[in-house]
Amino acid sequence: MNKWISAWVKNNYANAKRDLCTCFINRGFNLSNDHGYISMITASSWMFISSFEEFRKSLLRRSSITSMIQQSTHGYAGVTVPTTMFVLAEGAQGVTGTYIRLEDFDRPQWQEPRALEALADPDCGWLYCRAALDFADIPGAPIAYWLPAGSGKAFLERRCADIFQSAGRTKTHNNEVYLRKWWEISTAKLGAKWRRYCNGGGFSKWAGLDYDVVNWSTEAIAEYGSHGGLPNMDLCDKSGLCWGLITSSKTSFRVKPANYLYSSGSPTLIASNPEETISAMAFLNSSLCEAYLDALNPTLNTTVNDVLALPCPDTDAGVLASARQCINLVEDDWDSFEASSSFRRHPLL
């Protein structure tokens, strides 16, 4: 949008100003008759992204989604934009809508056959029936129709924010100077000038990816602090959980050992009870949590606020024991290779 249109939209469609397509949806409400229907094809970004939260809430108050087909990024030949086609019933509340999800069929020639297949066979696996009011229970009200029916109620119970605190982050502002791999540093200097450092990385559930160390000398700490780059000093030495901020696949949660520091690329949460951390990690590494995160923020970044908004089941002794076993197994596997500082020999030797 140019400046003139941007200013006009801001004045006339305040809660839809982020995109012209949402402005057109709002305009559709103005043009429709009472209890009329509005049908459009738009980009699908408004369904999930946080900047459209107020727009979604307004839409759900004013209407129900009676049907929707969410197409893949390459749903049309020559177009690389995820789109959605939908019908809104203006003034209706509590209507159960029919949703078809074609995201996994990322070819133009697959869109129509898979949509027709879903209509012929509701048990195909990509057709869902959901009431629009269910979305209001999920933080941010995303149009997450693929979640199990009633799963939004879980967000009304205990959340991760009830047991975890954000531990901040370390920002060196010059990683080339202040970061090293652990094998580049004398072991005599580890724990004094150099501290172990969680720094994001690839996919690894439960444990691992602890390659890095950070300069933690008095001079380095002063430098980080001068740029606002120090973590929560009351929490940073405690054990917790962390994950990689940026991921192109699934988010993986793992242990942040006590006395390990962490970067902004490895968001970290601390609970007052270490058992709560281990138990929560079992849920966070589950397929259900993956579906929740996909609903809350279907982008490449998984932020602290995304995780704090997740539901958190009560601690269960059986789950706790299984989670500890998973951690031990992954740690043993990690220590079987030279990248681990606890490596002794390859298991095949």
Where are these regions (language model features)?
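Ligand-binding pocket scaffold of soluble enzyme catalytic domains
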Residues: 230
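Amphipathic alpha-helical
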Residues: 197, 201-224
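Signature of N6-adenine DNA methyltransferases within the class I
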Residues: 1-188, 209, 223-227, 238, ...
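Extended amphipathic alpha-helical segments enriched in small hydrophobics
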Residues: 305-349
